[in-house]
Amino acid sequence: MGTSEAAPPPFARVAPALFIGNARAAGATELLVRAGITLCVNVSRQQPGPRAPGVAELRVPVFDDPAEDLLTHLEPTCAAMEAAVRDGGSCLVYCKNGRSRSAAVCTAYLMRHRGHSLDRAFQMVKSARPVAEPNLGFWAQLQKYEQTLQAQAILPREPIDPE
């Protein structure tokens, strides 16, 4: 007789008040409430929104396509996420599989509002969700976003992240 493994939770904690997951996460009402999620960032055009009372939705309408323009959505999305956190809430960022789009947005947030380099921010996301892998187009946009943040002195030009 084989042992059956429990299904992994639909979302994982990346950092305080920041979670990443797949589309099933939005339907996990009890888990959303328990985690203190107040904002769900739905990085998709088609996936359903959250079903938990008191949980707001911000939709970032992009497909998981390297040609999609995610970059223009990063500043307003990260600002909304930070506002939710400053109000005492937590954010869940999700897309269909919790792999590319949501990973890119979580990485951008960690750069913009936690001061991490692109490499360090993505390492944090990947540690929380091992399947995380932004597509090549999103990765290039994250590199451009990092350069923009460095030019604005939001991020240091030389990484200061501990090894």
Swiss-Prot record:
Family label? Belongs to the protein-tyrosine phosphatase family. Non-receptor class dual specificity subfamily.
Boundaries of every Tyrosine-protein phosphatase domain copy: 10-151
Catalytic residue list: 95
Query: Which is an annotated Pfam family here?
Result: DSPc
CDD domains assigned to the protein according to its UniProt record, in alphabetical order = DUSP28
What task does this protein carry out? Answer: Has phosphatase activity with the synthetic substrate 6,8-difluoro-4-methylumbelliferyl phosphate (in vitro). Has almost no detectable activity with phosphotyrosine, even less activity with phosphothreonine and displays complete lack of activity with phosphoserine. The poor activity with phosphotyrosine may be due to steric hindrance by bulky amino acid sidechains that obstruct access to the active site.
Where do transmembrane segments lie in this chain?
A: none
One annotated GO molecular function: protein tyrosine phosphatase activity
Principal EC category: hydrolase
Biological process (GO), any one: dephosphorylation
Q: Which PANTHER family match?
A: DUAL SPECIFICITY PHOSPHATASE 28, IP21249P
Q: Does the keyword Glycoprotein apply?
A: no
Give the organism, scientific name: Mus musculus (Mouse)
How this chain assembles, per its entry, is: Monomer.
Under Enzyme Commission nomenclature, its number is: 3.1.3.16, 3.1.3.48
Q: From the UniProt record, list the reaction(s) this protein catalyses.
A: O-phospho-L-tyrosyl-[protein] + H2O = L-tyrosyl-[protein] + phosphate; O-phospho-L-seryl-[protein] + H2O = L-seryl-[protein] + phosphate; O-phospho-L-threonyl-[protein] + H2O = L-threonyl-[protein] + phosphate
Q: Which PROSITE patterns match?
A: TYR_PHOSPHATASE_2, TYR_PHOSPHATASE_DUAL
UniProt keyword list: Hydrolase, Protein phosphatase
Q: What is this protein called?
A: Dual specificity phosphatase 28
Q: Which SUPFAM superfamilies match?
A: (Phosphotyrosine protein) phosphatases II
